[in-house]
């Protein structure tokens, strides 16, 4: 599934947290487990509409996106992971807006949000931008051996979710983007 080295930079606090990461590959969902092996990932309901995918998603501990279910898991002491954009971004620049669900989940559960940035070793470049997000993702799905070699996972400092949901969502996105490693050309 992965080609190249996987490197995790940073550590998590003890106890339940909401991991909030950028989403530039379908492999991100598995990489949250490199941060905390017991993390439960919130995934799009479409995953559960296909019998084959549903079987594996349940086996891997994925949970259909639901604020109530996520809050319940966190209150049980589990770690939950979410990609607040809800969509895969082909270029890895975290340009899509974050949805407010992550902040609302953390507020209701009373747990910190931990920003996470997945940085893959190779991105396709701007040539894919004329295409829709769906087409970009299909291109990357077909060409993943060329465009997703190795990954660095950067874990940020925990954030208190208290405050205005929209403001905290913007701050969460800024914290995730700030974790992007500097890459020399």
Predicted features along the sequence, with ranges:
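N-terminal membrane-anchoring alpha-helices
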Residues: 1-7, 137, 182
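Residue-level preference for the first positions of well-ordered beta-strands
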Residues: 16-18, 79-83, 114
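Catalytic core of membrane glycerolipid acyltransferases/transacylases, capturing the structured
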Residues: 11-69, 92-94, 124
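A cross-family acyltransferase "interaction/gating" segment
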Residues: 93-164
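Anion (oxyanion) recognition and catalysis
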Residues: 58, 74, 107
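Catalytic-site beta-strand/loop segments enriched in glycine and acidic/polar residues
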Residues: 73-103
